[in-house]
Amino acid sequence: MAEEIKDKQEFQIGAEEPDSSNVASQAKRSAESELASTADANDKKSKKKRRRRNYDDLDEKIAQEDKASATSGANKEEDSESEVDDEKLDQMMVKEDEEEDDLSEIDSSNIITTGRRTRGKIIDYKKTAEKLEKNGEVGKDDDDDEDDEENDEEFKDPAAPAPAPASPTEPK
């Protein structure tokens, strides 16, 4: 077993030793990669170099336009004011149209005029109150506190003793 391990190690070491042909091909590859990397570096430098934009031509054009407008200055000012007024009117028209659209989308039949929501049913509360009085169902909700105490006693453990009510005169 130990001999097999030594043989494997020697084989691996022998495989790692470079041949003369491998050395030559590796040297060629490294030289080619160096040339390619320097060429890429030069290309990158030239791409990074940017000239500052020359605005002098633009300035000259603007100066010429200003001179031309100075001769007809009054007419242009009136035109610009009327354009501004037109824009304001257009914006106001658009706003009014939007408001009208909002109001047209609202269905007045869905507006609740009373303070109670009934999920679409129209209820006359006066009539329902009269019907409840006739049936004797008025005042049912008044006795809720007593019902709660009765329900509590029903659910209590029968083996557990009931707590004695505390009297206001006894010291705590």
Curated annotation (Swiss-Prot):
Q: How does it assemble?
A: Forms a heterotrimer with H2A.Z-H2B, stabilizing the association of the histone dimer. Also, with a lower affinity, forms a heterotrimer with H2A-H2B.
> What role is this protein assigned?
Forms a chaperone-bound H2A.Z-H2B complex that acts as a source for SWR1 complex-dependent H2A to H2A.Z histone replacement in chromatin.
Q: Which InterPro entries match?
A: Histone_chaperone_domain_CHZ
Location in or out of the cell? Nucleus
Q: Where is the composition biased (Basic and acidic residues)?
A: 1-10, 54-68, 121-139
Q: Name one Pfam family in it.
A: CHZ
> Which family, according to UniProt?
Belongs to the CHZ1 family.
- Chief place of localization: nucleus
Q: Name the residue ranges with Pro residues bias.
A: 160-172
Q: Where does the source fall among the domains of life?
A: Eukaryota
Q: State what protein this is by name.
A: Histone H2A.Z-specific chaperone CHZ1
Q: Name one GO cellular component term.
A: nucleus
Q: Where is the composition biased (Acidic residues)?
A: 78-88, 96-105, 140-155
Keywords attached to this Swiss-Prot or TrEMBL record, sorted alphabetically, are: Chaperone, Nucleus
Membrane spanning stretches: none
Q: Where is this region: Disordered?
A: 1-172
